[in-house]
Design a protein with these regions (language model features):
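Glycine-rich P-loop/Walker A and Walker A-like loops and their local beta1-loop-alpha1 context
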Residues: 6-62
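Conserved catalytic network of the ASCE P-loop NTPase/AAA+ motor domain
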Residues: 19-22, 47-51, 95-98, 131-136, ...
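Hydrophobic/aromatic beta-strand patches that form the interior of the parallel beta-sheet core
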Residues: 27, 56-58, 74-76, 141, ...
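Structural motif
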Residues: 28, 103-107, 141
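Short, charged/polar "capping" segments at the starts of alpha-helices
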Residues: 37, 63-68, 149-151
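Conserved inter-motif catalytic segment of the P-loop NTP-binding fold
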Residues: 51-114
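Substrate-engagement module of ASCE P-loop NTPases
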Residues: 115-116, 121-148
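Phosphate-binding/switch region of NTP-binding enzymes
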Residues: 138, 144-180
Length: 180
C-alpha cells in the first residue's frame, strides 16, 4: 500500500495548487500537444533524480521522445502495435520487475489509438494499469490529447486516476485546472 509521503512535481506553483503529490499518485494531464506535457515532465523528472529516485520512461509513441536514455533514466521501448493484450502484459511485467517507489513517465496515451483503433482499449489499459502502479507506491505521469477521446473514456480515466489536470494556454500563459 502507498505510504502517502509528499512528492514534488518540480513546479512550485503546481505543488502549491495540489498540496504536492503523494506516493501512489497517477497523474493524467489533458493537453493540447506533447510540448505542453513535456513542460511538466521535465521538472518532475529533474526533481525525482535530484531526490535519488528511480525514473522509468515507457516509450511507445511516434512523437519525439520525452526523455533520453541517460544512465539515470531507464527507458523501455514498447510495441503498441503488438495489440492490447501483449502491450499490457509487457507494461505489467516491467512494472513488476521495477518494483516499488519508482517514478514513471508514459508516452501520450492518445497515441495508442493509432495502434489499437479503439478508444475503449485505451481506457481499459489505464483502468488495469493505474491500480497496479498505486499498489506499488509509484508516481506516474500520463497524457491525453484534448478532443481525441470519448467522454466515456475520459470519465473512466478520471474515475480511476488520483490526479487529473486540464492544461491549456490562455493569453500566452500555461494554465492548469485541477479536475480531480
Amino acid at each position: 500500500m502507498p505510504t502517502f509521503s509528499r512528492v514534488s512535481t518540480g513546479v512550485e506553483g503546481l505543488d502549491e495548487i495540489l498540496n504536492f503529490l503523494q506516493m501512489g499518485d497517477n497523474v493524467v494531464m489533458q493537453v493540447d500537444d506533447i510540448e505542453a506535457y513535456k513542460s511538466f515532465v521535465l521538472p518532475y523528472v529533474r526533481t525525482a533524480l535530484a531526490a535519488h529516485r528511480r525514473v522509468v520512461y515507457m516509450r511507445f509513441s511516434h512523437h519525439e521522445a520525452l526523455l533520453k536514455n541517460t544512465g539515470q533514466i531507464t527507458v523501455y521501448k514498447l510495441n503498441a502495435n503488438a495489440g492490447f493484450e501483449s502491450f499490457s502484459t509487457q507494461v505489467h511485467n516491467i512494472i513488476r520487475q521495477e518494483g516499488r517507489d519508482v517514478f514513471y513517465v508514459f508516452d501520450c496515451l492518445s497515441d495508442l489509438l493509432l495502434a489499437w483503433a479503439t478508444d475503449l482499449m485505451v481506457g481499459n489499459f489505464f483502468v488495469i494499469t493505474c491500480p497496479y502502479l498505486f499498489e506499488l507506491n509509484t508516481v506516474a505521469y500520463f497524457a491525453l490529447l484534448r478532443g481525441r477521446h470519448s467522454f466515456k473514456t475520459v470519465a473512466r480515466i478520471r474515475d480511476t486516476t488520483q490526479v487529473l489536470l486540464d492544461v491549456y494556454n490562455y493569453q500566452d500563459k500555461v494554465c492548469v485546472h485541477p479536475l480531480k
